[in-house]
Amino acid sequence: MILAADVSNAYISLGCIGNRGTYFTSRFAAISNKTEDEYAIDFLRTLELNGVPREKLEGCIISSVVPPMNFVLMRAMEIITGKTPLLIGPGVKNGLNIRIENPSQLGSNLVVDAVAALDRYQAPMIIFDMGTSTTASVIDREGRYIGGFISPGVRISLEAGASGTAQLPRVGLEAPETVIGRNTVHCLQSGAVYGTAGMIDGMITRIAEELGEPEEALTVIATGGALEKTITACCEHPIIFDDQLVLHGLWLIWLKNQGSHSSGRQSGKTRQNTKDNR
């Protein structure tokens, strides 16, 4: 069993995963001025709340898109596990066949998503990861990572609208009953939820055209939290929502870098006969 953290600009997703699957997941606000001791206390309390003795942890791994927080979080993990965390980046084995202009610029979160998706699902595929930004990763029929797109995330778009205008309020994010809003709150919610769903549907169609694939040939996966699940449920294309995708990818990468990938591999139940590009 290992301790795994996925660090975004807004949140830190923490979890324990092992041969038997995911033991727990938790989420913290990413606070840049916290010390390693404060994060160590947060992590330790989370382990205790979920009944996981820290002595049982064989290792730890971090995927981070916030470099200034890396040292503090690595120290926090080392304090509670006594082990040096594996930080995903250049030099860490992931097994991906990356075909973009500068592979070193590919975000660690996108690497983790792709590793997990290739282990669980059939290529060609699109992987949507919705957080501070909405990202898409495209894997072609040969299992190669060929690119994607990045757009502003739903929450940051709503926050920009509320802070940059005089009359638009901050609203809770949920799907209204109708696309046509009849008050300001419902209009904002419709734009956020149905507008994002429409963007995703439109990009799926365009990506399929560029790949020369029929839309039904694409496996479309999305990961994220409750809001992202709500959005994907409003899409017209069939989308697999996998909220354990990131943890599964972190587990696979950790195994690959221990020289024991084949002996402890946790295969996803929905995996089909994908090309093994490892």
What do the predicted segments below correspond to?
Residues 111, 166, 239-278:
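Glycine-rich phosphate-binding/hydrolytic loop that grips phosphoryl groups
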Residues 1-24, 117, 123-145, 161, ...:
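Gly/Thr-rich phosphate-binding beta-strand-loop-beta motif of the actin/hexokinase/Hsp70
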Residues 1-88, 92, 265, 278:
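N-terminal glycine/serine-rich phosphate-binding loop of ATP-dependent small-molecule kinases
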Residues 31-38, 106-108, 113-122, 146-192, ...:
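Glycine-rich phosphate-binding loop plus the immediately following alpha-helix
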Residues 48-53, 208-214:
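Alpha-helix termini
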Residues 50-106, 142-149, 153-154, 182-193, ...:
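Short beta-strand-loop/turn "lid" adjacent to the catalytic site in phosphate-handling enzymes
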Residues 196-212:
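A short, acidic, amphipathic alpha-helical segment used as a generic capping/interface helix at domain edges
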